[in-house]
Amino acid sequence: MVRRVACLAVIVLAFLAVSAIADNSAKEKAAIIIAEKWLSLVDAEKYAESWKEASELFRNAVKQEQWKQSLQAVRKPLGKLLTRKIKTKTYKTSLPGAPDGEYVVIQFGTSFENKKEAIETVTPMMDKDGKWRVSG
């Protein structure tokens, strides 16, 4: 009897672990879609629109004009985007300096016209309205 209960407990724990992994995988996929759409705005130099599409946390931390000026200064010297591929993606519920919540930290290996190897880190978060938005 004890052996059956122990086996059942192991099966339940394994099921819960697989379920959590699958849930995080779905969240990572949703966050990646948002990150790529957001980066396409940045690539198209639609900086004001990228600011508007960012999370509330992001918009409260950075003024729109400041964001536009920063991106113009940083992105222009890089030239046109050549390639971008996901290197890593990690689901987190806590990040340094940010409120607890749901985040996916995504690193892209990126190549630009004037910078052959770059790492871009984009962190979508689940915003208050239940939608994924870029927070940093």
Where are these regions (language model features)?
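Bacterial N-terminal signal peptides that target proteins for export
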Residues: 1-8
